[in-house]
Amino acid sequence: MSAEVETSEGVDESEKKNSGALEKENQMRMADLSELLKEGTKEAHDRAENTQFVKDFLKGNIKKELFKLATTALYFTYSALEEEMERNKDHPAFAPLYFPMELHRKEALTKDMEYFFGENWEEQVQCPKAAQKYVERIHYIGQNEPELLVAHAYTRYMGDLSGGQVLKKVAQRALKLPSTGEGTQFYLFENVDNAQQFKQLYRARMNALDLNMKTKERIVEEANKAFEYNMQIFNELDQAGSTLARETLEDGFPVHDGKGDMRKCPFYAAEQDKGALEGSSCPFRTAMAVLRKPSLQFILAAGVALAAGLLAWYYM
């Protein structure tokens, strides 16, 4: 009888130890930076999922001019990020995540810029106003709080390795870009043989960083700030769209920009049948004229770049 009691007590004690070990393991896992980022940015993911701009991008509803300008916004963003990563490559809170050969995108983006704009592309482009705020934030973090740089690196590169491949196919199909990669070098990671395995390595390195819980929480907060900067770009896009709509009504635009055969335009043909041609303005030509405004071009570019960044998070 006593032996049975001892055996029972031994089993109970063993179960308690196993339960305690499991609980401790779960606590440690939830304290991992990758898990904290995943849980801590869920709300940002939810907002992104309901963005019409992202849905349209997935459907291939994007024009080549906007894609060119999106590449411009990405170029300035990654130039800032990689400049600060280079500055902090020996910092203990970032050094294990320094993978220039595998991850850096500036060189690839330079090739894309040359493809879209020509050799003198640097003379033709400027950083969008809203994107400039994000660039300034990255520089501030790199120079003053480098322990938070991981928030921006993880958000961008892990997303690019995941959803970026989907975006590449969408862009090539919608814009009829060469299958050999011209114009989409940004999405090509030549030195990463297996994206899934590399992401696992990156997360393991990130989780092994010697950071206290307070710093980890600040990193999660910084990752959410990155999303907020992107959402501000959308707000600017909406405001610019309303402003330009008013400008269109006030200023007007030349009929078909004075080019092409008006009789071949479906809009004018329909209006002529209704006897309502005089005073009408083709919406297609109006839109094209609006898109030629530099201010809108760069705002739309930032919007497209934002969509790419947000969409990439879905596939992480």
Swiss-Prot record:
**Recorded E.C. number(s)?**
1.14.14.18
One GO MF term on file is: metal ion binding
**SUPFAM superfamilies, alphabetically?**
Heme oxygenase-like
One GO cellular component term, please give it: plasma membrane
Regions of compositional bias (Basic and acidic residues) in chain numbering: 13-27
- The organism is Homo sapiens (Human)
Q: Which Pfam families match?
A: Heme_oxygenase (PF01126)
Subcellular location field: Microsome membrane; Endoplasmic reticulum membrane
Q: What is its main location?
A: membrane
- Transmembrane stretches in the record are 296-316
Query: What residues bind heme b, as annotated?
Result: H45, Y154, K199, R203
One Gene Ontology biological process:
response to oxidative stress
Region of interest (Disordered), ranges: 1-29
Regions of compositional bias (Acidic residues) in chain numbering = 1-12
Q: What is this protein called?
A: Heme oxygenase 2
Q: Which family does it belong to?
A: Belongs to the heme oxygenase family.
- Name the chemical reaction catalysed here: heme b + 3 reduced [NADPH--hemoprotein reductase] + 3 O2 = biliverdin IXalpha + CO + Fe(2+) + 3 oxidized [NADPH--hemoprotein reductase] + 3 H2O + H(+)
PTM per Swiss-Prot/TrEMBL: A soluble form arises by proteolytic removal of the membrane anchor.
EC top class, as a word: oxidoreductase
Q: Where is this site: Important for catalytic activity?
A: D160
Q: Where are the HRM repeats?
A: 264-269, 281-286
Topology of the protein relative to the lipid bilayer:
Single-pass type IV membrane protein
Give the InterPro entries listed for this entry. Answer: Haem_Oase, Haem_Oase-like, Haem_Oase-like_multi-hlx, Haem_oxygenase_CS
Residue positions, PTM S-nitrosocysteine: C265, C282
**Protein's UniProt keywords contain Transcription regulation:** no
What keywords were assigned to this record?
Acetylation, Endoplasmic reticulum, Heme, Iron, Membrane, Metal-binding, Microsome, Oxidoreductase, Phosphoprotein, Repeat, S-nitrosylation, Transmembrane, Transmembrane helix
